[in-house]
Amino acid sequence: MDPSININLLGAGKVDLAIVQLDVLKFVSELMQKEADFNVFEQAKVVLNLYLEEIHVITRNEGLLSLYQLEDKKVAVGPQRSGSALSAEVLLAGYDLRVQAVFDAPNDALGKLKSGELDAMIFVGGAPVPAFENLDDSFHLVRMPANNVLEQIYRKQKIGRSVYSWADDSETYAVPSVIMTRERNDRECVATLQKLLIAILLNKETLDSTGHPKWKNSFIRSIVGNAGYRPAVDVLQIFDVLEGSGYRIIKK
């Protein structure tokens, strides 16, 4: 499910957990305060750091090599108010670019790239994104030049042939994704959430070997500061102390 929709559902109390791109929070915070009386930065807390999600800018146009060349081009940015669309807005503003934005989902956008109806598409997701793995050599990634403003928001990253067989190494940016919950002290909910967190930590090796490749580079053991959900932070700290003392936690 889309990260922007996720945080909206969390704020409305319709879900207990939400996977969120951190750059999305700035966009939705004011709207959620107005529509749901939900203060994202005070009432939403990080349960678990996940991994970096790369910004993919993909084209079949051989003349589009740098992001600056997207000026006035027709570019799919994902469904309206989606995480990809919001990240695309930040990205394009950072480069002071104007494009003809099309709000197509990734699979629709790929079809239109093949037919020539679109010049490029922007999508944010942890590489490798399954929809992009089997593209042919007529596709390539558009390079993102260094940008001091964007580097305050995103992390510099490279995607290339080691991830996608059709892609040469290309500079891009990535955004951290996290699992968030509402600040609350319901004992049953806290216990359930802690059990889930423990299950993830205990099965990290299985996730590394059989899950998405991003699990191998995840940040799930990193402890969040004031933005962290206290019951989750407690679990992470206990794991760190025990493993630091030479103990290995196993499920009975």
Predicted features along the sequence, with ranges:
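Soluble non-cytosolic domains of exported or imported proteins
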Residues: 1-4, 19, 61, 78-86, ...
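Short, glycine-/small- and polar/acidic-enriched structural segments
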Residues: 1-68, 76-79
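Mature, folded catalytic cores of secreted/periplasmic enzymes
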Residues: 10, 36-37, 41-42, 59-60, ...
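Sec/Tat-exported extracytoplasmic proteins
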Residues: 14, 19-22, 26-29, 61, ...
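Pocket-lining segment of extracytoplasmic ligand-binding domains
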Residues: 33, 87, 97-186
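Bilobed "Venus flytrap"/periplasmic-binding protein-like clamshell domains
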Residues: 53-111, 115
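Ligand-binding clefts/hinges and TM-proximal coupling segments of bilobed small-molecule sensing domains
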Residues: 80-91, 155-225
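An extracytoplasmic/periplasmic, membrane-proximal ligand-sensing/linker region
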Residues: 108-117, 121, 125-136, 141, ...
